[in-house]
From Swiss-Prot:
L-isoleucyl-5'-AMP binds at residue 552. Keywords: Aminoacyl-tRNA synthetase, ATP-binding, Cytoplasm, Ligase, Metal-binding, Nucleotide-binding, Protein biosynthesis, Zinc. The gene is ileS. One of its GO terms (cellular component) is cytosol. It is found in: Cytoplasm. This is Isoleucine--tRNA ligase. ATP binds at residue 596. IleRS has two distinct active sites: one for aminoacylation and one for editing. The misactivated valine is translocated from the active site to the editing site, which sterically excludes the correctly activated isoleucine. The single editing site contains two valyl binding pockets, one specific for each substrate (Val-AMP or Val-tRNA(Ile)). One of its GO terms (biological process) is isoleucyl-tRNA aminoacylation. Belongs to the class-I aminoacyl-tRNA synthetase family. IleS type 1 subfamily. Its cofactor is Zn(2+). It comes from the Bacteria. InterPro entries: aa-tRNA-synth_I_CS, aa-tRNA-synth_Ia, Anticodon_Ile_BEm, Ile-tRNA-ligase, Ile-tRNA-ligase_type1, Ile-tRNA_ligase, M/V/L/I-tRNA-synth_anticd-bd, Rossmann-like_a/b/a_fold. It catalyses: tRNA(Ile) + L-isoleucine + ATP = L-isoleucyl-tRNA(Ile) + AMP + diphosphate.
Length: 921
C-alpha cells in the first residue's frame, strides 16, 4: 500500500493562475448572453431603490486611469447595493456636445465654413457616437455592469427634448435673460466660457504703471497732476474709460522732478524705489471720496477718463488707483454701469482689435501689449514696465489664455434663487465633508451663469426674435420645439426656416408682419449634462429624482455637481441628489499628473491586456480614492501579489471541500470545536466590518480587512494547522467535517463579500464551488451578520491564545535560525506559564501541538522554572527542543508511538488506526 494514496489531498478545478486577460472576456460573454443585468433587476424588483446617477464622461478619446477609477467605484457601489437588499439599476451616460468634438472634426481636414451648419453637426454626431461605442467597449471590458444597450447620451433626441423643457421652465420663472456684460471669452475657442470651463495657470505678463493727466480737478487736484494706475493687461488701455479709487483710503499728491503724482498713501513707500520717487515730497493728502468725478484725459485718445469711487480699489498692490475698462472686467463693468460709462470692448471673437481701437486695428490682443506699451512711452505716460509671473485664467479645453470681454450673451440669473441653492447644498450629505464648504462657497460667490456659446455643436437656444427685436420664449414655443427635437433631433433647428420651427399660426405683437428670426447660439455643455436629472432620472421609469448618489471627480464641484444643482433647484426647488461623493485624480507612481509629454501615462486597456480587469478593480479598492491616488507598474505589481494571496486562499478552501456536501456533512455550530467556532466568529466579524465599510464607501478598508483575514487568520493559522486534520484524518471524521464546515462557510462568505470588487474571479470561484448550472454569484445576496453563542467569551480567550502563539512562532523562528531545529514539525514546545496564561490554557480545548504545528507540546506552571535559554515574553517563556520519537511516514509528525502497529511499522498510532479502519480491504 502506498500511504500517500490514503491522504485526502486537495482537489479542485480552480486553477492557481487566474489567466484573467483570457478568462474575463469569457465570463463577460456569458453574462451578456444570459442577460445578467436584467436578471439582477428582476431579482431585486419590489425592493427599496438605490439610484446612483452616472455623471457622463466626455465622448472623446481613449479611456484613462481616471475613467477606470471613476467607473469602478460606481460599479462597486451598485453591485454592493444590488446584493444588499436594494434595487439598484445603473444607466451609464455620455456627454457628447462641445468644442473638443468640433476640433477633432477640424483636425480631420473638414472645413466647417465650407458646409452648412447642419451638415457639420451630422459629422460631429457621427464622430461622437463612434467615441461612445469605443468607450462603451472599454467600460464593459472593465467589468462594469449596467444597461449598456440603453445608455443616456446627451445628443439623443429624447434627451435634448427634456433639456429644452428645463430651459423653458427656468425662463418661465424669470431666471433667463440676455445682457451685455464681460464674460470669460476664449479667443482660441471663439466663444464665451462659464466659470466651470476656466482653469488657472502661471503666465508671464507685462506689468505697467501709467500716468493719466487731470483735466478737471474739481477744486481738489491741480490741472496737469498725474493719477498713476497699474495694470498687467496693457492691451486693455485702449478700452479705458475711467479710474477707480477707494473712497475710504487716503491718497497723497507728491511732487517729483517738477511733476505731481497721486498714489495711495499706504503704497508710497514701495513706489518710491519702483518709480524713482525717492526724492519726492508729499504736497497734500486727500480722501478717495474727495476725488470722485475728477476728470483725467486718456493717454493717447481724445476722450475723458473719469475718476470714480469703488470698494474694489485697494492698497494691497499697485498704486491704489485702478485702471477701469468696463468692457473687459466684472468690477469695471459694474462701476461703469453705475457711472454711466460706455461699455467698450474693441475686440472681435478671435481676440483681434476692431476699428474701435484706432492704431491697433487687426492686431491680436496679446501682440498689442507691446504696441500699447510703446505708444504710452511715446506720449510720455509710461512710468515703468516690468514682467511678472502670475496665475491667469485659461480655457480648460485649449489651454490658451482667456480674456474678459463684454458681449451680448444669454445668462441664467443666480441671484434670483441663490438662497435656495445655498439651502439645498446644506441639505445634502457630502463625502468628503469638505465638499459641502467647497460647493457652498462657489454658489455663494459665483456670478450669473453665461449659458450661450457661439459654436455649432450643441443644443440650440430655443429662442425666437420678433421684428422689434423682442426675444420670444413662451410655453407654446418651448413645448413645440421640445416635441420637434424629440421627433427629429436638434439638427432640425438648423435645417428648417424659422416659420417651419414655430407652431402653426403663431403670432406675436412684436411682429405685425409675421416675420421672425431665430437665435444662432447654442447652450453651454454644462447645461446639457446639468439637465440629466430631468432627461434621465425623471424620464426613465426605473429611475427617480432625487438620486441617492452622484459620484464624480473633485473637479465636478465646479462642473456637474454645480450645474445639476443649479438647474434642479431652479425647476424643482430641491437638489437632484441626496448624497455626493467625490474622488481625487489618478497620478503616476511619483505623484505627478499623467501626460503624454512626460511619457508617464498608464492606460487601463493596456493594463487589462497584461494583468486583467480584476487587478485594475482591486487597485481601485486598495487606494484612498477621496484624495489623489497613485498608480504605476510597481503599484499594480503589489496589488497583483495581494490578488495572488486571495486566489490561493480560495483555491486551498475549494480544494479541501471537494468531498464535502453542505447539506449532509455540515457540523452544527454547537457541535464544533472551540477553535472552529472562533474562526466562524472571526468570519462573522469580517462580514459586519466589510458591510459597514461598503456602506461608508470605504473600499480600501475592505481591501485590508479581507487581505488580513486571508493572510493572518486563515493562511498563517487555521489553514496551516488544518492540514494535519483535513489531509490526515478519515474522510468522515468529526474534526475533519468540522473544519470543512468552516472552510465552506469561509469560501461562500469571502466570495460574496468580494463579488462587487472582483466580479470575474468570484464568479469563477462560485462556479467551481456550486458546479454546473450554478446561478451567478451576482444574483446572490450578501451574507447576514449572525448572532453566534458565546462569541465574546470565545473571542477573548482565543485572541489571547493567538498572542501567545505569536510568541511561540518567534521562538521557533529563532530556534531555526540558530540551527537548533530544522522544520518546526521536528520541534517540541515547552511553555512555561503563570497566572492568567495558566488559567487561559486550562480553559482552552485543543491539541496544542497541532495548533502550534509542532510534534510535541508540554505546559509547565511557573515562569521561574523556565531555563535561561528559554525565549521570554511578559506572560510566558518558550523552550524549543527536538521532539523525541520518529517521524510518521504518513502525517510527518514526530511521535513516540511510531511502529506501535507491527503491520504498519512506519506509522504512528493515529495513522495506523485510520489506515486499518478505512483503507485496508
Amino acid at each position: 500500500m502506498e500511504y500517500k494514496d490514503t491522504l485526502l489531498m486537495p482537489k479542485t478545478d480552480f486553477p492557481m493562475r487566474g489567466n484573467l486577460p483570457n478568462k474575463e472576456p469569457e465570463w463577460q460573454a456569458k453574462w451578456e448572453e444570459e442577460k445578467l443585468y436584467e436578471k439582477i433587476q428582476e431579482k431585486n424588483a419590489g425592493r427599496p431603490t438605490y439610484i446612483l446617477h452616472d455623471g457622463p464622461p466626455y465622448a472623446n478619446g481613449e479611456l484613462h486611469m481616471g475613467h477606470a477609477l471613476n467607473k469602478t467605484i460606481k460599479d462597486i457601489i451598485v453591485r454592493y447595493k444590488s446584493m444588499a437588499g436594494f434595487s439598484s439599476p445603473y444607466v451609464p451616460g455620455w456627454d457628447t456636445h462641445g468644442l473638443p468634438i468640433e476640433t477633432a472634426i477640424a483636425k480631420k481636414g473638414v472645413k466647417r465654413k465650407e458646409m452648412s451648419i447642419a451638415e457639420f453637426r451630422k459629422l460631429c454626431a457621427e464622430y461622437a457616437m463612434k467615441q461612445v461605442d469605443g468607450q462603451r467597449t472599454g467600460f464593459k471590458r472593465l467589468g462594469i455592469n449596467g444597461d449598456w444597450e440603453n445608455p443616456y447620451i446627451t445628443l439623443l433626441p429624447e434627451y435634448e427634448a427634456e433639456q429644452i423643457k428645463v430651459f423653458g421652465e427656468m425662463a418661465k420663472k424669470g431666471y433667463i435673460y440676455k445682457g451685455k456684460k464681460p464674460v470669460y471669452w476664449s479667443p482660441s475657442s471663439e466663444s464665451a466660457l462659464a466659470e466651470a470651463e476656466i482653469e488657472y495657470q502661471d503666465k508671464t505678463s507685462a506689468s505697467i504703471f501709467v500716468a493719466f493727466k487731470v483735466t478737471d480737478g474739481k477744486g481738489v487736484l491741480d490741472e496737469g497732476t498725474n493719477i498713476v494706475i497699474w495694470t498687467t493687461t496693457p492691451w486693455t488701455i485702449p478700452a479705458n474709460m475711467g479710474i477707480t479709487v477707494n473712497p475710504d483710503l487716503d491718497y497723497v499728491v507728491i511732487e517729483s522732478a517738477g511733476e505731481k503724482y497721486v498714489v495711495a498713501e499706504a503704497l508710497l513707500p514701495s513706489l518710491r524705489e519702483k518709480l524713482g520717487f525717492e526724492d519726492a515730497t508729499v504736497v497734500k493728502t486727500v480722501r478717495g471720496s474727495e476725488l470722485d468725478r475728477v476728470v483725467t484725459k486718456h493717454p493717447f485718445y481724445d476722450r475723458d477718463s473719469l475718476v470714480m469711487n469703488g470698494e474694489h480699489a485697494t492698497a494691497e498692490a499697485g498704486t491704489g488707483a485702478v485702471h477701469t475698462a468696463p468692457g473687459h472686467g466684472e468690477d469695471d463693468f459694474l462701476i461703469g454701469k453705475k457711472y454711466d460709462l460706455e461699455i467698450l470692448a474693441p475686440l472681435d471673437d478671435r481676440g483681434v482689435f476692431t476699428e474701435e481701437a484706432p492704431g491697433f486695428e487687426g492686431v491680436f490682443y496679446d501682440t498689442a501689449n507691446k504696441m500699447v506699451t510703446e505708444k504710452l512711452e511715446e506720449v510720455g505716460a509710461l512710468l515703468k514696465m516690468e514682467f511678472i509671473t502670475h496665475s491667469y485664467p485659461h480655457d480648460w479645453r485649449t489651454k490658451k489664455p482667456v480674456i474678459f470681454r463684454a458681449t451680448a450673451q444669454w445668462f441664467a440669473s443666480i441671484d434670483a434663487f441663490r438662497d435656495d441653492l445655498l439651502a439645498a447644498v446644506k441639505g445634502v450629505n457630502w463625502t468628503p465633508a469638505w465638499g459641502e464648504t467647497r460647493l457652498f462657497n462657489m454658489v455663494r460667490d459665483r456670478g450669473d451663469w453665461v449659458i450661450s456659446r457661439q459654436r455649432a455643436w450643441g443644443v440650440p437656444l430655443p429662442i425666437f426674435y420678433a421684428e422689434n427685436g423682442e426675444a420670444i420664449i413662451t410655453d407654446e414655443t418651448i413645448n413645440h420645439i421640445s416635441e420637434l427635437f424629440r421627433e427629429h433631433g436638434s439638427n432640425v433647428w438648423f435645417e428648417r426656416d424659422v416659420k417651419d420651427l414655430l407652431p402653426a399660426g403663431f403670432t406675436h405683437p412684436g411682429s405685425p408682419n409675421g416675420e421672425f428670426t431665430k437665435e444662432t447660439d447654442i447652450m453651454d455643455v454644462w447645461f446639457d449634462s446639468g439637465s440629466s436629472h430631468q432627461a434621465v432620472l425623471n424620464a426613465r421609469p426605473e429611475l427617480s429624482r432625487p438620486a441617492d448618489l452622484y459620484m464624480e471627480g473633485s473637479d465636478q464641484y465646479r462642473g456637474w455637481f454645480n450645474s445639476s444643482l443649479t438647474t434642479a433647484v431652479a425647476i424643482t426647488g430641491e437638489a437632484p441628489y441626496r448624497n455626493v461623493l467625490s474622488h481625487g485624480f489618478a497620478l503616476d507612481g511619483e505623484g505627478r499628473k499623467m501626460s503624454k509629454s512626460l511619457g508617464n501615462t498608464l492606460l487601463p486597456g493596456k493594463v487589462i491586456k497584461q494583468l486583467g480587469a480584476d487587478i485594475v478593480r482591486l487597485w481601485v479598492a486598495s487606494v484612498d480614492y477621496q484624495a489623489d491616488v497613485r498608480v504605476s507598474d510597481e503599484i499594480l505589481k503589489q496589488v497583483s501579489e495581494v490578488y495572488r494571496k486571495i486566489r490561493n486562499t480560495m483555491r486551498f478552501l475549494l480544494g479541501n471541500i471537494n468531498d464535502f456536501n453542505p447539506t449532509t456533512n455540515t457540523v452544527s455550530y454547537e457541535n464544533l470545536r472551540e477553535v472552529d467556532k472562533y474562526m466562524l466568529i472571526k468570519l462573522n466579524d469580517l462580514v459586519k466590518n466589510v458591510k459597514d465599510s461598503y456602506e461608508a464607501f470605504e473600499f480600501s478598508t475592505i481591501y485590508h480587512q479581507i487581505n488580513n483575514f486571508c493572510t493572518v487568520e486563515l493562511s498563517q493559522f487555521y489553514m496551516d494547522f488544518a492540514k494535519d486534520v483535513v489531509y490526515i484524518e478519515a474522510a468522515d471524521s468529526h474534526d475533519r467535517r468540522a473544519m470543512q464546515t468552516v472552510f465552506y462557510e469561509a469560501v461562500v462568505t469571502l466570495t460574496k463579500l468580494l463579488a462587487p470588487i472582483l466580479p470575474h474571479t468570484t464568479e469563477e470561484v462560485w462556479n467551481s464551488l456550486i458546479g454546473e448550472g450554478a446561478e451567478s454569484i451576482h444574483l446572490q445576496d450578501l451574507p447576514d451578520v449572525k448572532v453566534l453563542a458565546n462569541s465574546e467569551e470565545i473571542t477573548a480567550k482565543w485572541d489571547a491564545f493567538m498572542q501567545i502563539r505569536d510568541n511561540v512562532q518567534k521562538a521557533l523562528e529563532f530556534a531555526r535560525n540558530e540551527k537548533l531545529i530544522g522544520k518546526s514539525m521536528l520541534a517540541k514546545v515547552t511553555l512555561y506559564v503563570d497566572g492568567e496564561a495558566k488559567t487561559l490554557f486550562d480553559s482552552l480545548e485543543g491539541d496544542f501541538a497541532q495548533l502550534f504545528i509542532v510534534s510535541d507540546f508540554e505546559l509547565v506552571e511557573g515562569l521561574e522554572n523556565a531555563p535561561e535559554s528559554a525565549f521570554k515574553s511578559n506572560q510566558v517563556a518558550v523552550q524549543i527542543t527536538v521532539a523525541e520519537g520518529e517521524t510518521c511516514e504518513r502525517c510527518r509528525v514526530v511521535k513516540k508511538d511510531v511502529g506501535v502497529n507491527p503491520k504498519h511499522p512506519t506509522l504512528c498510532g493515529r495513522c495506523a488506526d485510520i489506515v486499518v479502519k478505512h483503507y485496508e480491504a
